[in-house]
Amino acid sequence: MSEADPVGEKGPAEDDGEESVPFNPFLHEFEPKGLWQNARFYILGPILFPLRFLLAAVFLFLMWPIAALRVAGLTDKELSCSIRHRRTILHHLIYLLSRTMFFMCGFHWITIRGRRAPASEAPILVVAPHSTFFDPIVTVVCDLPSVVSRVENLNIPVIGALLRFNQSILVSRQDPSSRKKVVEEVKRRATSNGEWPQVLFFPEGTNGNGKVLLKFKPGAFVAGVPVQPVLMRYPNKLPATIWTWKGNGVFKVLWLTMSQFYINLEIEFLPVYHPTAEERADPTLYAFKVQKIMADALAKPATEFELIGDTPVSPLGHLKVALDPKIWELGNILKKAGFSLDSVQGLIDLCLEGVCSRVGLDELAEKLGVTQHDVISRVFNYFNKDAAGMIDFREVSLVLAAQDATRSAEELAKLAFDLFSTCDADGRSLLSADGFASVLRSLLGSPPAESGKVFTELYTYTELQGLTQDGFVRFAIRHPCYRHLFLFYLRPPSSGRRKPPQIQQNGGCSGKNNPGKQSKMD
């Protein structure tokens, strides 16, 4: 992009004709429309839902004692080996009850395409897309394979018994070494030449709306053994089964699903994929390749959207950006608490004059004029604390400034530079790596490691000990990838300019830019 390219006060003059994948694959909301749909869900629903739910619950609880009998009396040593050939009559009973339970929910027919490979050929099954809590029905089609689950789930009635029944691999969030043990156990079972039952993974790690494939996590691929991709499709006229991070709740999805006469489900087994030597050595590359194969078969985009903690994120170059910036949430709760944006400039001036730097909870409440303890605590906890439990008030001022829809993207970038730049020995104002990280952390929530990669990329083109104001503004306004952050992503919702960052399939930046090979800025 040259200096002559039109850049308006609030963003580019045009959207460059770029298309992005759906903005939020973690969002799905469905409401019945029309007379027939409303009749189905609100007239048939009160009849079908209670009956189906009750019958499904009965068959679920019938599995409890049978699953417990499978492992009753077995020692830890015996359970460390496969018990797939022991007490097989109980396995068949659980299989029958499982299929009946899903039948009661409305899954009367399951269309199966392809052939499931035996454990000796494909010790691991990877299933996608993961779009609903009904997806475990695939375990019935796959003859009740083992799964990876949290150890806390052992304490859930019925579920815990079923996890013990199929010798699931358990991971503990409290044990730092647990993930390493899980990896070793997956490798041990996967290389047992079919002695153990197959291990089934949902490699996306969470539910999406099914319109794209989320980023595959490498856990299913660390063993470096062949895997069999398994596709799930719900070819129904109404997307009632989908349950995502944000949207229809559990009860509503159950009601909408069980109010239909029946639910269509297709499960397709793709050919077993044998990794190359390079892919065996790199689980991330292996996961990427399998994701691409499954995406092509589904005719859906393969993306790097993922859920980190409780935050849905999308990739933009070296950064992982929250789909819904938390700074708008902070602005909303402060507004409800009576805080006015009219006072922001005064707070900014104090920071520029060096009057205030680090503040505690009480001092933050005093400066913002907010007395509600719960509100000020949420705001305070958003920012990084130092060893003394203090936060940088410059970060607070920058976040508050971003709430102002009248402030242009360029003005916000210049303010960020002024707040966090320092003078070098020659008196030049420069933005250091730490200052750059503080800007991205406060506005985007980006970890320092990610910010450091971006800074290193930009710093390559200068001999100074940091970025000049012009260099930082070019990054914010004209960089072929990251400009979308300041021009669109960080525009307040009230400005009407809020858009997702332009994201390509499988991550990267918009246009022709690859996150690993960014072109030099103009």
Swiss-Prot record:
One of its GO terms (molecular function) is 1-acylglycerophosphocholine O-acyltransferase activity. Keywords: Acyltransferase, Endoplasmic reticulum, Glycoprotein, Lipid biosynthesis, Lipid metabolism, Membrane, Phospholipid biosynthesis, Phospholipid metabolism, Transferase, Transmembrane, Transmembrane helix. Its main location: endoplasmic reticulum. GO terms for cellular component: endoplasmic reticulum; endoplasmic reticulum membrane. It is found in: Endoplasmic reticulum membrane. It catalyses: a 1-acyl-sn-glycero-3-phosphoethanolamine + an acyl-CoA = a 1,2-diacyl-sn-glycero-3-phosphoethanolamine + CoA; a 1-O-(1Z-alkenyl)-sn-glycero-3-phosphoethanolamine + an acyl-CoA = a 1-O-(1Z-alkenyl)-2-acyl-sn-glycero-3-phosphoethanolamine + CoA; a 1-acyl-sn-glycero-3-phosphocholine + an acyl-CoA = a 1,2-diacyl-sn-glycero-3-phosphocholine + CoA; a 1-O-alkyl-sn-glycero-3-phosphocholine + acetyl-CoA = a 1-O-alkyl-2-acetyl-sn-glycero-3-phosphocholine + CoA. GO terms for biological process: phosphatidylcholine acyl-chain remodeling; phospholipid biosynthetic process. Residues 502-522 have a biased composition (Polar residues). A motif (HXXXXD motif) lies at residues 130-135. Glycans are attached at residue 166. Pathway: Lipid metabolism; phospholipid metabolism. Residues 496-522 are annotated as: Disordered. The chain crosses the membrane at residues 43-63, 92-112. It comes from the Eukaryota. Its EC number is 2.3.1.23, 2.3.1.n6, 2.3.1.121, 2.3.1.67. It is a multi-pass membrane protein. Belongs to the 1-acyl-sn-glycerol-3-phosphate acyltransferase family. Displays acyl-CoA-dependent lysophospholipid acyltransferase activity with a subset of lysophospholipids as substrates. Prefers long chain acyl-CoAs (C16, C18) as acyl donors. This is Lysophospholipid acyltransferase LPCAT4. It comes from Xenopus laevis (African clawed frog).
